[in-house]
Amino acid sequence: MDYPPEHIVNQSGPVGDLKITYGGAPDQVIEFYGSTSNPTVLVLIHGGFWRPTIDRSHLQPLAFALSAQGFYVALIEYQRLPGRPYQSLDDVLAALSAIVDKKVILFGHSAGGQLAILAARKITNCIGVIAASPVADLQAGEKENLGDGAINLYLGGSAQNFQDLDPVLLSPPSCRVEIMHTQKDFIPLNVAKNYYEQHKSNSSKIDFTLLADSDHYTLIDPRGAGLVQLVKAVNKVLMNKIGEG
């Protein structure tokens, strides 16, 4: 899919205040934005259908904008290797292990939403997940031929053979999960909402929001109204955590 030069997917920068590596591969890096005094890190996990051609750079403007709102932000990169799906999750977990002495909120967009939900199940310092237009039901996405076969390319096979990577089939994380989808999204509604429908009866910490007059990129473009919606979602997670004690 081609986008005009001004589209958010074609934007990049500013780079983070600090950049660290969490492994030896070029994509095993984290950029940090904002003040380290904040006790909570907002971790951004980009989408792009797990394709090696789409990296974190289009989320740099969002990371910078969120830091200007007072959040301490970590923008992580991870390896995207067709047919090696566990590597992406392993990288996300390795990146998170490099963030010490902080609580984390995971924000994942599209394919990054799938990784965020999976990662939250594996760590103990996560207080919330915000999954925006997430690919949260791999088998449903496969049936929709999402991204022209992106799921099969990512997995290296059929989704039914990778049930341990399919969020809808797994128990939810212990932290709060906010599923956000958009009215004009090219990710089919059921691919995101099935996760909420599957788990809402078993957890009071799962919520679903459908944003009107918005598209797949609204929540990651800080130049529009999506930034306000995202900040509200982050603050909702923070306030609920305070309420839980």
Language-model segments: residues:
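N-terminal cap/lid segment of alpha/beta-hydrolase-fold proteins
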Residues: D2-T36
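C-terminal catalytic histidine-bearing segment of alpha/beta-hydrolase fold enzymes
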Residues: K193-Y196, K200-G245
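The feature captures the conserved acid-bearing segment of alpha/beta-hydrolase catalytic domains
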Residues: A140-E142, S158-V191
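Hydrolase active-site cap/lid region
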Residues: L118-Q160
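Gly/Ala-rich beta-loop-alpha elbow adjacent to hydrolase catalytic centers
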Residues: G108-G112, A116
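Catalytic nucleophile-loop/oxyanion-hole region of alpha/beta-hydrolase
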Residues: T53-A63, A74-K103
